[in-house]
């Protein structure tokens, strides 16, 4: 870490120093005066929250974790593209139940990469009924949403998918499994 030099040095805010908050981007999102769809990807799961600004601290109105997909019978991994998409559908349905129909996407410090898991959550939220301003170019295509790339990789390296088989899912059946879980999530009102 570089030490402060000179009288004009300004110490960055704590969350900026920790690499957690980009305050310039946060201000632009807050000026929209809409709730934020906050998406965070961890090593094990996908987290999506609808967050509203409050002067004393942001308020989480609705929070969903990809582990909640297990309640609907999801047998796949919790942090891949299909799980992110299904998490997006679930957050949209729960937000609509709370009376929130629109939001702006907050990806934090994630790099906005076309077709990434962050945008898979966005696609799920939009298809689930949430209005979020976006460009269709960034959304992942249907084959990635359904997990066809995972099924194709399974054909090349079947020994890497022991966890799927322990949970009772053959990775080649993943696209059909995604469609099945999507149908269950879409009927939530």
From Swiss-Prot:
Metal-binding in keyword set: no
InterPro entries (alphabetical): Rbsml_uL18_euk
Disulfide bonding pattern of the chain: none
GO biological process: one example: translation
CDD domains: Ribosomal_L18_L5e (cd00432)
Keywords: Ribonucleoprotein, Ribosomal protein, RNA-binding, rRNA-binding
GO terms for MF: 5S rRNA binding; structural constituent of ribosome
A Pfam family hit: Ribosomal_L5e
GO cellular component terms listed in the entry, alphabetical order: cytosolic large ribosomal subunit
Entry keyword Cell membrane: no
Similarity comment: Belongs to the universal ribosomal protein uL18 family.
Subunit structure: Part of the 50S ribosomal subunit. Contacts the 5S and 23S rRNAs.
HAMAP family cross-referenced by the UniProt entry: Ribosomal_uL18_A
Function, in words: This is one of the proteins that bind and probably mediate the attachment of the 5S RNA into the large ribosomal subunit, where it forms part of the central protuberance.
Official protein name in the record: Large ribosomal subunit protein uL18
């Amino acid at each position: 870490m570089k030490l402060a030099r000179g009288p004009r040095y300004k110490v960055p805010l704590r969350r900026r120093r920790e690499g957690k908050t980009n305050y310039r981007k946060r201000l632009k999102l807050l000026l929209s005066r809409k709730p934020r769809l906050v998406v965070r990807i961890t090593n094990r799961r996908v987290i999506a929250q609808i967050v509203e600004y409050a002067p004393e601290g942001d308020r989480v109105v609705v929070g969903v974790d990809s582990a909640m997909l297990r309640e609907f019978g999801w047998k796949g991994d919790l942090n891949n593209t299909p799980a992110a998409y299904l998490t997006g559908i679930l957050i949209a349905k729960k937000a609509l139940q709370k009376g929130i129909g629109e939001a702006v996407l907050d990806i934090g410090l994630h790099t906005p990469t076309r077709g990434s898991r962050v945008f898979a959550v966005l696609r799920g939220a939009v298809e689930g009924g949430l209005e979020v301003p976006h460009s269709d170019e960034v959304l992942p295509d249907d084959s990635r949403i359904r997990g066809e790339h995972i099924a194709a990789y399974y054909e090349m390296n079947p020994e890497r998918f022991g966890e799927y088989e322990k949970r009772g899912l053959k990775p080649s059946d993943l696209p059909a499994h995604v469609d099945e879980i999507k149908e269950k999530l879409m009927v939530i009102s």
